[in-house]
Each structure stands twice: as structure tokens, then as C-alpha cells.
Design a protein with these regions (language model features):
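Mid-to-C-terminal alpha-helical segments outside catalytic/metal-binding sites
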Residues: 309-340
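A charged helix-plus-loop insertion that forms the helical arch/lid used to bind
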Residues: 92-105, 149-151
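Catalytic domains of carbohydrate-active enzymes, especially glycoside hydrolases
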Residues: 32-45, 116-118, 123-128
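Second-shell residues forming the walls of enzyme active-site clefts
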Residues: 20, 26, 48-70, 74, ...
Length: 341
């Protein structure tokens, strides 16, 4: 299943996108996008989920559609962190936030929260959780992370973050540590602005520690941040679009071999400054595996066309993309073969 030699180009490109849709049922426009543009992965929000029964049926419908059109399982993704960041319906289990778990001082509770979350998600048909936040919340004015972080202490974030990752992956769901290389020292929210982290190497090392340790411990996914890090990337591009950060640091220096996802490319940090469609190509050029376009699937369709053109004229290296596709398909195989608790 993980060989991509016989996959046509559009189907291959579609593997590199995760997209969302409105409502609790598949929209005709979304179905058409999967059929024409071979979108291979889905993100779910609260807008898609009314009950456990409905979510299970929806996930089965998504898998049937994607398998028939793309020939492979879909990554069905969700932001189910616990606490304030929950997408599931009230008849599902919502574990406490990262900071609440950390306040107990017992990281085994974080592991158990991960197992509970993953077991339920997997039973409902979801196989990727964009959690936990590995951000070190060192800025008290941070408007977006706050209690989503385990702590302002990198060792505490590492201890609890690794425990939750272990629990999620033990439960058969891919854990995705976010927001690399750290969203904890910002006073702006990348949903609505383009933050800059001005710290030098010593300061950045604090924020990188949980990610470095999570990679060593076997986290299967990492999500990028739409933040400028001048100490890491001298050009005025956020981490998501930086080959220096996404490939040289994350892949080469830290040795990460799992899947790299972008944060949503419709966030204003990207959309207002770089353009969602154009930045999707830049993210793939930087070494990201899966581009997330959460709300407007027509933007993903345009991005697929742009990637096709970039492969044709050499702006995007075909061999590098093939290696990335192989990682995605291997991850899908791994998830499909895992036993569910």
C-alpha cells in the first residue's frame, strides 16, 4: 500500500493536502473536489460533529470516498487537545486542558488522558490528533496558547507532553506535537497576525527542548507555526515556509522522520502576507509533508494546480516530493494496521 510508483500525479499531489468542509454531512462541492483533485485527507471541526453516532457514520463515508477516489485511506484529523480546545460533541469525552493536567504534578494522568482521547477518536474513525501543544508558555501576554500549554517550564512541558504523546499513540492515533519551533513566546495570535519571536539562541533553546525530546521519544507528527524566527531564519518568512527550519533544523539536525503538517494556511499570518495558495507551494518547497487548508476546499484545488505547474517547471523537486509522498503512505499503512485498544 505504501508504494507510490503507480500513482498518477494528481493523486500523488492530493495526498499532501488536508481539507475541511462545513456541516455534519459531506458537501457536494467537497465530494467533487475529492473526485477531481484527489484531496486525500480531512480535518474535522465542531461544525462537522453532532453526536458520536453521526461522527462514526461521517468518518466511514469519508474513508469510502477517499479510498474509492484516491486508492488509499484518508488521514482524518482533528484538534482534540482537551479543555478549551475540543471539537467533539457533548456525548464524547473531553479531558482536562494541558495546564490542568500539569497542575496535578502526575504525568501519568497526561498519559491516561492521551489513551482515553485516542481510544475514543479511533473508535469513531479519527486517526490523527493535532495534539499536544509542546509550546513553552513563557509570555504571560500570549493570547492564543495559555492553558493549552503544560507550563512555562520546558522540563515540565517535556515531561507531560511526552506522556500525552505516549498515551495518544498507544491508543492508535498519530500524535502531532505543535507548534514547531514554538508559539509560547508570542504576544500576537497567528490566526489574526504574523508574530515575531525575537529571542536569541539561548532563548530559543528553551522552546525547542520539548520538540527535540518528543522527536527522540518517537512522536509521529509535528505541526509547524506561522511565526517569524529571525535567529533561525534570516529571511522574512515564517517557520512553515522556511526550508532552514522545516528541513535543515527539523529533519537534518533533529532527525525527525515522521510527518510534518502545516498549521492552517488560511490563518491571517499566511493568507494576508503570502497568500494561501502560493504559500502552500512554498511550504512543500520548505519540506513540509501535508498542507492544511481547513475551510475553503476551492483554495486547495487551486493549490493542487499550482503544485502541478511547479513540478512541471522545476520549482518543486519531484524526487523530494516522492519521498514525502512515501512518508505519508507509510504513515497511513502504519495507522491502518495498528490494533485498536
Amino acid at each position: 500500500m505504501h508504494e507510490n510508483e503507480n500513482m498518477d500525479l494528481r493523486t500523488q499531489i492530493g495526498q499532501h493536502f488536508v481539507c475541511g468542509f462545513d456541516g455534519p454531512t459531506l458537501e457536494p462541492s467537497f465530494i467533487e473536489a475529492v473526485k477531481r483533485y484527489k484531496i486525500g485527507n480531512i480535518i474535522l471541526f465542531a461544525r462537522n460533529i453532532k453526536s458520536k453516532t453521526q461522527l462514526y457514520a461521517l468518518c466511514q463515508e469519508i474513508q469510502d470516498l477517499v479510498r474509492s477516489e484516491c486508492g488509499h485511506d484518508a488521514l482524518i484529523t482533528i484538534d482534540q487537545e482537551g479543555g478549551m480546545v475540543t471539537r467533539l460533541s457533548p456525548d464524547c469525552t473531553n479531558v482536562p486542558s494541558a495546564m490542568a493536567l500539569s497542575a496535578t504534578g502526575d504525568e501519568q494522568l497526561a498519559r491516561q488522558a492521551g489513551v482515553i482521547t485516542a481510544t475514543e477518536l479511533r473508535a469513531l474513525g479519527v486517526n490523527v490528533d493535532f495534539a499536544p501543544s509542546l509550546d513553552v508558555n513563557s509570555n504571560p501576554d500570549n493570547p492564543v496558547i495559555g492553558v493549552r500549554s503544560f507550563s512555562d517550564d520546558p522540563k515540565q512541558v517535556t515531561r507531560f507532553g511526552l506522556a500525552m504523546i505516549e498515551g495518544l499513540q498507544e491508543g492508535g492515533v498519530m500524535a502531532v506535537g505543535k507548534h514547531f519551533p514554538g508559539h509560547g513566546d508570542t504576544h500576537l495570535d497567528s490566526h489574526v497576525a504574523l508574530p515575531v519571536v525575537e529571542g536569541g539562541e539561548e532563548q530559543l533553546a528553551i522552546h525547542l527542548e520539548p520538540f527535540r525530546k518528543a522527536i527522540s521519544a518517537g512522536v509521529q507528527g509535528i505541526m509547524s507555526s506561522h511565526i517569524l524566527f529571525p535567529a533561525l531564519e534570516p529571511d522574512p518568512v515564517p517557520a512553515t515556509l522556511s526550508r532552514t527550519i522545516m528541513t535543515d533544523l527539523l529533519r537534518s539536525e533533529y532527525g525527525f522522520k515522521g510527518l510534518v503538517f502545516t498549521d492552517c494556511m488560511e490563518m491571517q499570518a499566511i493568507a494576508d502576507h503570502f497568500g494561501t495558495v502560493e504559500a502552500s507551494l512554498q511550504a512543500l518547497q520548505a519540506g513540509v509533508d501535508v498542507v492544511c487548508i481547513s475551510h475553503h476546499v476551492e483554495l486547495a484545488c487551486k493549490a493542487v494546480e499550482l503544485v502541478e505547474a511547479a513540478l512541471a517547471d522545476g520549482r518543486l523537486d519531484a524526487d523530494s516530493l516522492k519521498q514525502s509522498t512515501k512518508r505519508i503512505l507509510q504513515a497511513k499503512t502504519m495507522l491502518s494496521e495498528q490494533e485498536i485498544l
